[in-house]
């Protein structure tokens, strides 16, 4: 470990100069523990990470900042693929935005589980599983039919005895549906712009993050500045 630390002290991280071009970007943030993370912008066309910065939490201003830096250098954002975090569609509201199908399905599963107990949940999960092989018209129809059948159900309220306070009786099913409804305009962007070759997942950057964590976690005792040097070396040198 001491040898590794000494080597990192000697390393001067130099970012490779790449000629700016028009490309689809995948911006996202990954964390190493609760309050230390790295926000990364990956160029899909080049399969390279072009910009990154340390963060203590995921906030939209970081994405605004990263986008501006890249555009000031001459990079053109033709579209982005995001994980669905609220606020991301606003950062990139002037270009096509695709929400990752994997993350959308993960969100719905978080609310419904893999084996929903209610009939409403079971039917909604079946609709969700159609996402990767559906299109906007078909998926919208399926969601609309589900809402028509279960609208009263997801609006049912339970009142707390002796108070005026209440909560939605089937809150998790409701949340799963609202997530799909809210993100629907961004779930089939990749089909609307075939010429841009937009993927429907963030797999390219997810794979980069997995590789990064495998490497960094081996040296978990590193001081913060040394750890970031290692992160920069890995992010800047990766191509797959």
Task: Describe the residue ranges of each PLM region.
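Conserved beta-strand -> loop -> alpha-helix junction used to position metal-binding or nucleic-acid-contacting
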Residues: 79-125
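Core catalytic machinery and nucleic-acid-binding channels of phosphodiester-processing enzymes
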Residues: 1-6, 95-100, 219
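Alpha-helix boundary/capping detector
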Residues: 33, 96, 114, 118, ...
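Acidic/histidine-rich catalytic cores and adjacent linkers
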Residues: 78-86, 92, 126-240
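RNase H-like nuclease fold core
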Residues: 2-86, 90, 183, 204
């Amino acid at each position: 470990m001491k040898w590794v630390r000494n080597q990192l002290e000697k390393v001067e991280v130099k970012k490779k100069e790449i000629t700016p071009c028009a490309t689809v970007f995948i911006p996202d943030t990954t964390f190493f523990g609760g309050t230390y993370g790295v926000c990364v912008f990956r160029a899909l066309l080049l399969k390279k990470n072009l910009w990154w910065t340390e963060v203590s939490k995921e906030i939209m201003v970081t994405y605004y900042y990263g986008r501006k830096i890249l555009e000031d250098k001459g990079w053109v954002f033709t579209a982005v693929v995001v994980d669905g975090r609220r606020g991301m569609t606003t950062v990139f509201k002037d270009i096509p935005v695709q929400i990752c199908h994997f993350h959308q399905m993960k969100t719905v599963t978080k609310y419904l589980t893999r084996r929903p107990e209610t009939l409403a949940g079971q039917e909604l999960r079946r609709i969700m599983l159609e996402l990767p092989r559906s299109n906007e018209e078909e998926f919208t129809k399926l969601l609309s039919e589900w809402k028509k059948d279960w609208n009263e159900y997801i609006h049912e309220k339970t009142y707390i005895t002796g108070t005026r306070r209440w909560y939605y009786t089937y809150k998790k099913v409701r949340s799963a549906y609202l997530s799909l409804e809210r993100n629907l305009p961004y779930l089939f962007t990749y089909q609307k712009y075939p010429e841009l070759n937009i993927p429907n997942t963030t797999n390219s950057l997810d794979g980069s993050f997995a590789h990064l964590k495998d490497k960094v976690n081996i040296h978990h005792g590193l001081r913060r500045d040394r750890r970031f040097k290692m992160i920069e070396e890995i992010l800047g040198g990766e191509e797959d």
